[in-house]
Curated annotation (Swiss-Prot):
Pathway: Pyrimidine metabolism; UMP biosynthesis via de novo pathway; (S)-dihydroorotate from bicarbonate: step 2/3. The lineage of its organism: Bacteria, Bacillati, Bacillota, Tissierellia, Tissierellales. Pfam families: OTCace, OTCace_N. Keywords: Pyrimidine biosynthesis, Transferase. PROSITE patterns: CARBAMOYLTRANSFERASE. L-aspartate binds at residues 83, 165, 227. GO terms for molecular function: amino acid binding; aspartate carbamoyltransferase activity. This is Aspartate carbamoyltransferase catalytic subunit. Belongs to the aspartate/ornithine carbamoyltransferase superfamily. ATCase family.
Length: 306
């Protein structure tokens, strides 16, 4: 049972529980009208201490599509924390207004702290550079709907693998399904952190690090592209030097298999050329829709409605 649970890290739920959410999401895709009033009278609180238009709108769309309502703020300046209120007091207060909370905060560990004070289910909508579990569920649903499986695949992750929290969460999640291996494509300065490599080694999961996408794209079942995130850099010169490191275009797509699935958590800058958008293997805009659907399923499960 997922009722009244929190979702802080991608590994908070076991594989069976994740599959339960994905199966419900697939039901919603097949018959959305059956779910349009299940959260009538329920209120979602969206507490976004860090701007994120897509994630916030996705949560808001999800609760509205379920017949519920939404209250919250989109930046810390709009909250009482700008007046000096502690995160603990904010969470305690909002728990009295809402039935469920989605929170994004730039400080790592803030979601764990918030969950200890929340009196309603709390969803981590992004926690510094550490975890982004609902994006992981979105990615899993996208792969499932596209490939019809979550195991026995070669998954390439490309771009900013150091600061990209979606990458870290996805690697850990896909590692729980059998016989997946990873190809990590990045410049040396943006390689995946050591703790992720140690995690993969501890699980005896095959992975390799490469610098050239074109050398490995033909081996991939899934290619997960990421942008180089300016906001994670302390030095603008480093950002400018690395931001165009990896661009996926039609020439590189010609080297890929016919059933490759290209994902991207968005927003895109220029790491995927717009000419790729019309390629049927590009599923990153479908991924946006799946993000709303999987958040609908998650809300239903945590509220115990389904």
């Amino acid at each position: 049972m997922l009722k009244n649970r929190n979702l802080i890290n991608a590994d908070d739920f076991n594989v069976e529980e994740i599959n339960e959410i994905l199966n419900l999401a697939e039901e919603i895709i097949k018959s959305p009208s059956d779910f349009s009033n299940l959260c009538n009278g329920k209120i979602l609180g969206t507490l976004f201490f860090e701007p994120s238009t897509r994630t916030r709108l996705s949560f808001e769309s999800a609760i509205h599509r379920l017949g519920g309502d939404c209250i919250g703020f989109s930046e810390s300046a709009s909250s009482s924390t700008s007046k000096g209120e502690s995160l603990a007091d904010t969470i305690r207060t909002v728990s009295n207004y809402t039935d469920i909370i989605a929170m994004r905060n730039p400080k790592e560990g803030s979601a764990v702290l918030a969950s200890s004070y929340a009196e309603v289910p709390l969803i981590n909508a992004g926690d510094g550079g550490h975890q982004h579990p609902t994006q992981t569920l979105t990615d899993l649903l996208t792969i499932w709907m596209t490939k019809k499986k979550l195991d026995n695949m070669t998954i390439g992750l490309c771009g900013d693998l150091k600061f990209g929290r979606t990458v870290h969460s996805l690697i850990k999640a896909m590692s729980r399904y059998e016989n997946n291996k990873f190809i990590l494509i990045s410049p040396e300065e943006l390689q995946v952190p050591d703790y992720i490599k140690m995690f993969l080694k501890s699980k005896n999961i095959e992975f390799k690090e490469v610098e050239k996408m074109e050398d490995v794209i033909g081996e991939l079942d899934v290619l997960y592209m990421t942008r180089v995130q300016k906001e994670r850099f302390f030095n603008e010169a480093d950002y400018v030097r690395l931001k165009d490191s990896y661009i996926l275009d039609n020439d590189k797509m010609k080297l890929a298999t016919e059933d490759l699935a290209v994902l991207h958590p968005l927003p895109r800058v220029n790491e995927i050329a717009t000419e790729v958008d019309s390629d049927p293997r590009a599923v990153y805009f479908k991924q946006v829709r799946y993000g709303v659907i999987v958040r609908m399923a998650l809300i239903l499960k945590l509220l115990g409605v389904r």
